[in-house]
Amino acid sequence: MKSPFGGIAETLKPKMEDFKVFLLNQAETFENGVRAAARAAISPNGKYIRPMLVFASAPADADEKSLVRRATIAELVHLSTLIHDDVIDRADMRRNSETAYKKYGAKTAILLGDAIFSHMMSLAFEENSMAVLKKTADCVRTVCEGEIKQTLADRAEIVSREKYYEVAYGKTAALFELACNLGATAGTPPDGWREAAENAGKQLGIAYQIYDDICDWFMTERDAGKTLGTDLISGKQTFPLIALLEKLPAEQSASLAKNLPNEQPEKIAKLMRSFGIPEICAAEFSRRVAAAEESLGKFPAVNTGLLEFCSAMRNLKFG
């Protein structure tokens, strides 16, 4: 399936090629007994969305070597969280390959995620910037807290949209925001650009989480390249389900929320379609992308990459 991000990836091709070489070389820094697992985890099969955001946010005077390192920092944060997510979700497939959890078991996968995270912090230290270290550490904490909040949430209680956005920020948008920050601060941006880029990253991150939620309900595992259906099994109330619960009568809504893990996904997906849930999700997705574009519209001369990224987001297919 053709990537909707192919256009911006082509625009950023020289930088992305340097990044990929640098990223894959990071696996070679691990000890012999860990290197094979690190190579599999730091694979060349990702979409590299977060590194693209780093490059797309950078002012013209950004140092290229620093940018590549910052893009790698963003991707390694993402990879370490994916490894841990797969353990939590007991997922067997990621990026059309077996997950570390499937290959090595939960204990080794958790330690591998920790090792990659630790290596990422070592790279962040090389930036010789307390701001980079603090922003990165704060982001990781926010991501972990977002996952914890969703895991500990009362499954029988109907989650509000506001609560969902809070969790979505922690799970996904905080890392998009970090990537935009790392790019924007790699040079000397005009006043307000960092804040505008960060806000765009936040809005795009929430939009992407909504897209990811939709994939779990309406996309095939072959097209998604990963294990699907884990949200239902774990009883997580993602955006499509929350939108459905809003539409159902109170009694039916409460019953569905309470019995979610025992429900048939096909039955719920059919119900979602009957209530126009995919269209509701698409509308909220578009609203978030528009908010990102509005934030960036005040800085047309800094870097058009983020606006191009917004256009690519609009090409994502909702199942």
Residue ranges, per PLM feature:
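All-alpha prenyltransferase/terpene-synthase fold signal
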Residues: 1-319
